Amino acid sequence: MKGNMKVYWIKIAVATWFCCTTIVLGSTARIFSLPTNDEEETSKTLGLDTVSFSTKGATYITYVNFLNELRVKLKPEGNSHGIPLLRKKCDDPGKCFVLVALSNDNGQLAEIAIDVTSVYVVGYQVRNRSYFFKDAPDAAYEGLFKNTIKTRLHFGGSYPSLEGEKAYRETTDLGIEPLRIGIKKLDENAIDNYKPTEIASSLLVVIQMVSEAARFTFIENQIRNNFQQRIRPANNTISLENKWGKLSFQIRTSGANGMFSEAVELERANGKKYYVTAVDQVKPKIALLKFVDKDPKTSLAAELIIQNYESLVGFD
């Protein structure tokens, strides 16, 4: 009888320990949002290429190497006048995006999804949550960051849309410290009542320091040469960003002599306007071109598409 009682009390003790442990650990897991194995394997199961960059111990050299690796992962198809040309389209969801894993000195991580045909940011994951721009394609929303709690933001990824959340290029600092803070803010807003303005301002830093810097050697060098400082995009930087589509079109459709069919208006740092009429005038500033059909029969249609797109996002 005593032996049976001893076994009985042991069972009670074990059961009590199990229940308490489950409650405590379960609560702790929710507080810290520890990632599951499924979440950690998201990029692997999709077969997406991933490029990583950490602000911890970062130098301008590691930053430049990161941008070069990203350009390679985007897998441009051919070139125009020696400038790599991005893919025309992507039919395989598993190859339409590249993940950029950004981490900071605190170990906070944000995985940014980038479209390989345009270098546009479509969404990102922090902890067990993912967020997508309002205008992100359905293929991105449905196919990326599975096993996460998904949210469509009420604003898009265009500059005018970001400005609607008080995120302006002219007043946004760029550099290693702003990027570190941006990653931190994205991580801190992995909650139900997130702050749209903090997300928008943080994503604007990412867009400038990743997407735009990958497109333009000029912007890469601006950040590289002021890496440990805070800089803000001047008129020359903003005008290049706004005219990427038109520059790509003119370069792609120009003949062997590299002359543009139509001059492209740009601005200097002081806001003074000037015009470029040939590839050689802007080639040193551009690292990637957006695909534009070179066929004369479709080039006009392509130009109209670019003009329509740029009017939608607020570009000239």
UniProtKB/Swiss-Prot annotation:
Q: What EC number(s) has UniProt assigned to this enzyme? A: 3.2.2.22
Q: Which residues are glycosylated?
A: N235
Q: Which Pfam families match?
A: RIP (PF00161)
Question: Which reaction is this enzyme known to catalyze?
Answer: Endohydrolysis of the N-glycosidic bond at one specific adenosine on the 28S rRNA
The propeptide sits at 27-46, 298-316
Taxonomically, the superkingdom here is Eukaryota
Q: Which cysteines are joined by disulfide bonds?
A: C90-C96
- State any single GO MF term: protein homodimerization activity
Which BP terms does GO give this entry?
defense response; negative regulation of translation
Q: Which family does it belong to?
A: Belongs to the ribosome-inactivating protein family. Type 1 RIP subfamily.
Specify the protein name: Ribosome-inactivating protein gelonin
Provide the species name: Suregada multiflora
The organism's taxonomy opens as:
Eukaryota, Viridiplantae, Streptophyta, Embryophyta, Tracheophyta
